[in-house]
């Protein structure tokens, strides 16, 4: 019985982390209201978290909760679609390339930074 309660409390704690992270991510996304910087900074945060090898609770809170609601593929792709639909093909292509390249670069750089920081505090 005790282990069943322990498992249930861990699940509730994960749900709590998910809810709080999601709310904070959604509020910040709403306040920034700029798909490009939201997606780039979200990718950078993901890179840092993974590079640091943060604990599972921190990853659950930040990766699934916060970044899951903070970054916004659907809003961004709607902007791309509207540009294509209205004949701004080069702007749409530029938006696609800048977000993909920017997001990949931000994640790669912050992953590397996270690994360096981790090695400073936790030598191998």
From Swiss-Prot:
Binding site for Na(+): 68, 71
Major subcellular site: membrane
Key word Plastid present: no
Its membrane topology: Multi-pass membrane protein
The keyword Transport appears for this protein: yes
Transmembrane segments: 7-27, 32-52, 58-78, 93-113
Top-rank taxon, per record: Bacteria
InterPro entries (UniProt xref): FluC
Reactions catalysed: fluoride(in) = fluoride(out)
Family in the record: Belongs to the fluoride channel Fluc/FEX (TC 1.A.43) family.
Function description: Fluoride-specific ion channel. Important for reducing fluoride concentration in the cell, thus reducing its toxicity.
Name of the molecule in the record: Fluoride-specific ion channel FluC 1
Organism: Prochlorococcus marinus (strain SARG / CCMP1375 / SS120)
High-level lineage: Bacteria, Bacillati, Cyanobacteriota, Cyanophyceae, Synechococcales
